[in-house]
């Protein structure tokens, strides 16, 4: 993995888990608005790191925890996960011994997919991600609701380093067809599973609500997948800070 940090390591820590097909730097626009108050940690999965080998989710978590330990992080003010980053974040939350005060999932991909289906879809995912590199972001509109120039560099960088073997290994132990991992009721009370009302991942909301009945499942009406985060990183960052500091979501920040 590769790690970027923003802010003073003495401040409360916020750990980001990025979406599929992008690098950890995709959280930079949000982290830059938090860095005055928080220590932001942005890991990039080994899947998108040149010369690195993806082993397993457990190994990814080990690398994250090793980095947090080296940085002197003893607790996390918040874990923020976007799209498929939810899969790794959930594994982290259920395995880490570090206290986690809040968690926020933005359009989490809480899919439960059979092994055979994951294996079949891997070549298509690989081609889609690599095509973003080959076309310098020109094919983004074909796989996402927007093709903003501001986010293309993160897709291009990820596609450049992606290997088929690493993606195949990641898909072999991601989005597995099994019950969601358990979260304590106390952590659920401080966890937010947010979905945009018009995004495809909205279909996972009911299953999430049933698995984590004490959690919060806000809906951003009229918003697409990760739209608030992409189009208004400042507002998104302010919302995260409000959750961390007031333990509630500030709906006035979402218009």
Predicted segment positions?
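Conserved HGGG/HGGXW glycine-rich cap/lid loop of the alpha/beta-hydrolase fold
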Residues: 4-50
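Catalytic histidine-centered segment of alpha/beta-hydrolase-like enzymes
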Residues: 223-236
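Active-site loop/oxyanion-hole signature of alpha/beta-hydrolase fold enzymes
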Residues: 41-78
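Flexible "cap/lid" loop of the alpha/beta hydrolase fold
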Residues: 94-95, 100-131
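Conserved serine/cysteine hydrolase catalytic core
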Residues: 172-210
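Gly/Ala-rich beta-loop-alpha elbow adjacent to hydrolase catalytic centers
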Residues: 80-85, 89
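Conserved alpha/beta-hydrolase catalytic His-Asp/Glu region
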Residues: 114-116, 132-185
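Conserved small/polar residues in nucleotide/adenosyl-binding loops
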Residues: 252-255
